[in-house]
A protein has these predicted regions:
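Generic beta-sheet signal
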Residues: 4, 129-138
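Short active-site segment of divalent metal-dependent hydrolases/proteases
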Residues: 12, 139-140
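Glycine-rich phosphate-binding loop signature in dinucleotide/nucleotide-binding domains
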Residues: 41-43, 122-129
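Short beta-strand scaffold positions
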Residues: 49-50, 113, 134-135
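Domain-level recognition of soluble alpha/beta enzyme cores
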Residues: 148-178
């Protein structure tokens, strides 16, 4: 059995314009300590990650503890967002129609296809090992939806408030055989609020 620990990044600087280089807040850096605390008694064979700074920084301390390099994969990056793509109305539209995307943005299907392609390669290369994948809220949600199509907008809205968040998926080959949520830190995602919320 292959164990994959998906680690969704800690709290980032939401006002930072450039998505790829967006850093963690000071609070987010401190919250990242739970990642090492959780992983340190595991036998981690490899660390994979989105190339985005916030995801890499969330797992960096744990990778150093295990003296492992972080292997980045462009396909694991977060959803490309277009104009006004991160608000409650747009979340609902995208999860109601997985092919929908705003101008300049990616659909759920587009994000899912590249993340699952990367995951399948990682699973093929790491049979019966324990690995960590540094990820993002939407990217991870598309993976969870791939294996359980009941995972939708409400489930997505639940986990994007968790930064960081660790969930374990267990695989026999490329078949999912187990799932367990382990730990998270509650942080409200900016832009999540409904338009009618004061």
């Amino acid at each position: 059995m292959t164990k994959v620990y998906f680690v969704c990044h800690a709290q980032p600087e939401h006002d930072w314009e450039e998505d790829r280089t967006r850093p963690l807040t000071e609070e987010g850096k401190k919250d990242s300590e739970i990642v090492l605390e959780f992983l340190k008694d595991k036998k981690i064979d490899a660390f994979y990650c989105s190339p985005y700074k916030r995801s890499m920084d969330t797992i960096a301390e744990a990778a150093a503890f295990f003296t492992k390099e972080i292997i980045t994969d462009e396909r694991l990056r977060e959803r490309e967002k277009g104009s006004d793509g991160n608000n409650h109305g747009m979340f609902q539209k995208r999860w109601a129609d997985h092919d929908y995307h705003e101008d300049g943005g990616e659909s759920i299907v587009m994000v899912q296809n590249r993340n699952i392609e990367a995951l399948n390669e990682i699973l093929s290369d790491n049979t019966d090992k324990e690995i960590v994948i540094g990820t993002h809220g939407t990217a991870l949600s598309t993976i969870l939806n791939f294996y359980d199509n009941s995972f939708g907008c409400e489930e997505f809205l639940r986990i994007i408030d968790w930064m960081p968040y660790i969930i374990e998926l267990d695989f026999a080959g490329d078949k999912l055989v187990g799932k367990q949520e382990h730990c998270h830190v509650q942080k409200e995602f900016k832009g999540k609020q409904r338009a009618d919320k004061k």
